């Protein structure tokens, strides 16, 4: 993408006005999954992700974090997950034992606005509800 189409900061990273990022109960954000090397990439903007599911691409964590506003969205319950993403949100937002490698969502812990339904927020504690 040409610089004239997208602002670039002094570190050579693109600057998006908004990054709306999905999160999984396993802590993946975009297609940055736990215990995979893509999570630690620091220079590339976009990464290929080759997994058992169809191959995909994802923004790197530095690009996600370089957005002017970051919103992480988590919602939905199912028969398989009757409490939705509650455990994942607890681990992403308050669990001290998690690392970027084991739970990529912690990389956005202090920089994002977290939007979730009641089920996803149910394990966060009163200070978050």
Enumerate the predicted regions with their spans.
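Conserved phosphate- and dinucleotide-binding cores of soluble alpha/beta proteins
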Residues: 1-129
């Amino acid at each position: 993408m040409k610089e004239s189409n997208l602002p670039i900061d002094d570190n050579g990273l693109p600057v998006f006005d908004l990054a709306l990022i999905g999160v999984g109960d396993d802590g993946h954000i975009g297609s940055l999954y736990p215990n995979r090397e893509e999570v630690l990439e620091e220079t590339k903007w976009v990464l290929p992700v080759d997994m058992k599911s169809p191959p995909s691409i994802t923004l790197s964590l530095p690009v996600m974090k370089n957005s002017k506003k970051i919103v992480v969205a988590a919602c939905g319950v199912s028969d398989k997950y009757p409490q939705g993403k509650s455990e994942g949100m607890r681990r992403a937002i308050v669990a001290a034992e998690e690392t970027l490698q084991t739970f990529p969502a912690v990389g956005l812990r202090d920089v994002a606005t977290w939007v979730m339904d009641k089920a996803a927020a149910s394990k966060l504690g009163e200070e978050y509800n």
